[in-house]
């Protein structure tokens, strides 16, 4: 068994090595990659493998159905910024290293998008019906998918103290920078 980034076990590829091309799966992968919002999504498409577990396949299909329906019914789904910041995160693990400004800005926007998307999905099933009661869960699979996702709002707040909404370093990012910029004015 092979494990993807989503930590779900999937079977190894079917022999022969060109099986996907022979049955047209490679063209489906290309179509999926065209719709990905980030390079990380494209990587996940590359990692997809055949699955023969009916329950898992049905779960994935329900997630897709719900998300397609959600995109058709709601124009306000927060899907604005998804950046693959893994290289920067790997680099800053070393002591005395830090994000470059652009990396921090991408990291902040990605975290914010994830935070808003998870809150949006969680809020879907808390909406009230016409009688003022909590509406029936119409997006159960998406709700389950979002359940337990950590969104790190404190990191978003800390990044906001350093960069503004345009990705520029704030004068108040540090006392030293604030002093230098005041002296330059």
Specify the residue positions occupied by each region the protein language model found.
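Conserved amphipathic alpha-helical "coupling/scaffold" segments
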Residues: 2-169, 173
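Extended, Lys/Arg-enriched charged tracts that mediate electrostatic binding to polyanionic substrates
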Residues: 177-185
């Amino acid at each position: 068994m092979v494990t993807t980034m989503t930590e779900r076990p999937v079977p190894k590829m079917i022999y022969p090595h060109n099986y996907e091309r022979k049955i047209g799966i490679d063209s489906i992968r290309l179509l999926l990659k065209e719709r990905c919002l980030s390079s990380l999504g494209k990587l996940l498409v590359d990692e997809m493998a055949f699955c023969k577990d009916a329950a898992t396949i049905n779960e994935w299909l329900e997630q897709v159905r719900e998300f397609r329906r959600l995109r058709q019914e709601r124009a306000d789904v927060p899907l604005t910024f998804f950046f693959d910041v893994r290289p920067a995160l790997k680099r800053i693990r070393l002591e005395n290293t830090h994000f470059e400004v652009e990396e921090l800005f991408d990291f902040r926007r990605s975290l914010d998008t994830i935070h808003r998307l998870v809150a949006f999905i969680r809020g879907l099933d808390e909406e009230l019906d016409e009688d003022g009661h909590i509406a029936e869960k119409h997006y159960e699979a998406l709700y389950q998918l979002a359940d337990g996702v950590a969104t790190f709002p404190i990191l978003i707040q800390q990044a906001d103290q350093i960069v503004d909404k345009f990705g520029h370093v704030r004068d108040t990012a540090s006392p030293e920078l604030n002093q230098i910029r005041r002296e330059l004015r």
